[in-house]
Structures are given as structure tokens and as C-alpha cells.
Amino acid sequence: MKYIFEVRMKDGYTVEEYAEAWIEASRVIQQTPGARGTDLHRKIGEPDTLLAIAHWDSKAHRDAKDDSRSARVKAILEKHARTCEITPLGEFEEPEWRGGGR
């Protein structure tokens, strides 16, 4: 299962600052049962916009995560709420179809 969201930096906050904090929070979140990693992709032509993809074993695993268990993760998420526009794009199944090349 993939949880995908777009992140746009507000004025005065950089992608690098976001990514540094995101990596720190991800280290804690990845200790959650069912967590399978996260990826950040910078949007071509819009360097202050990222696509984030969180990989989970299932929707139930993601729904069960508790970000409040870590004061540091909670603080990072609260800061991101002030410094970024975060737009959830949705929850997606694993790929059903794949093209060639990988």
C-alpha cells in the first residue's frame, strides 16, 4: 500500500530543511509494524514541490500508526503544518500492472 502526498514549501522554508526533518521523523515512523520505507521526489520545473510516497504492508498498518508516541515526530509534523502546504493525494494499492524497463 502506498500513501502519497504532495508537499509545497512556503516562503522562508527550503526543501532541504523539510527533507532533513522528514528523514529524522521517518527513522522513528519506520519502527512501526508494517512500515516499509518512504521516498521523496522533487517535481521537475517546481523545485519547491515534492512528492512523498510512504510504503506500508497494508492500509490497516498505516491506520494503526501513532505519530504522537514520539514527541520529536509530533514536533516535526507540527512544524511542517506551519511551513508547508501538504496535500494528501490518496492511498493506493500495490501496482497491478508494470511496463518493461525495471
Put a short name on every predicted segment.
Residues F92-R102:
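Short, low-order "capping/linker" segments at domain edges
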Residues I23-R36, H55-G90:
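An amphipathic, aromatic/His-enriched active-site/gating alpha helix that lines ligand/cofactor pockets
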Residues K2-M9, D39-S70:
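Short, well-ordered beta-strand segments in beta-rich or mixed alpha/beta enzyme
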Residues R8-E20:
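Short, surface-exposed ligand-recognition loops at beta-strand->loop->(often short) alpha-helix junctions
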Residues R42, G90-E93:
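A general secondary-structure junction signal
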Residues Y18, V28, G45-P47:
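Generic alpha-helix initiation/capping and coil-helix boundary signal
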